[in-house]
């Protein structure tokens, strides 16, 4: 049986290979295939997969040319009256299990003394196996473009963005988030051009969703490290978080995304960091998911 570390390395290696092959567009064909949904979460508030499971299932769907966006365990499929087709293989996805550990305070404060103990919540990774509905007798029931119960209908992009209450200023020659003043600087919508992947309007929104992901990193929101400088590891890591977060939001909203030109400058940093430490990929996707959930409210 493969260990957790071996499986994490395999997942990281698959993404690295995609980065090396497709460059900054490594997520494009996956994202355009739609949000992966969970057969076992019918009727829940949010039936979507998030985090690293997005990348795992996006890549697998594209690689195996599946048409359905719905995935389920053997038991979930059986409970829905279906069966897995003979000879089909499952894919591992990640489950984060919480546990508590005892830690000690490192300094005195008004509420506790140095050395006092407290309980801290942590998580460990386990894996479980899922099948795409194309691999089962439920294929026709969960055909392409058929969302399962509980999946969100497409939301108007402007409404989605305005609901965040983020301060967005237009008229700039570049697009970026300013943590010290907590606003997003955007070029005018008319300044955006069409590309092979998407039209000008979609490029505007995919860029804005990238910057909106950065906006969630403010200390009053998801509190990520936004103090990095261009070229260093922390800066490149935050860009990976924003790239994944924007891709997920584009997928949810039905926006065809185009990678930022600047992403090419971070690509080698992403590859080197993930090659050195597969956990960096898991951390980036977890933080991107936290950002998306914050924006969704």
Label the predicted regions.
Residues 1-297:
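N-terminal accessory/interface modules of nucleic-acid-binding and processing proteins
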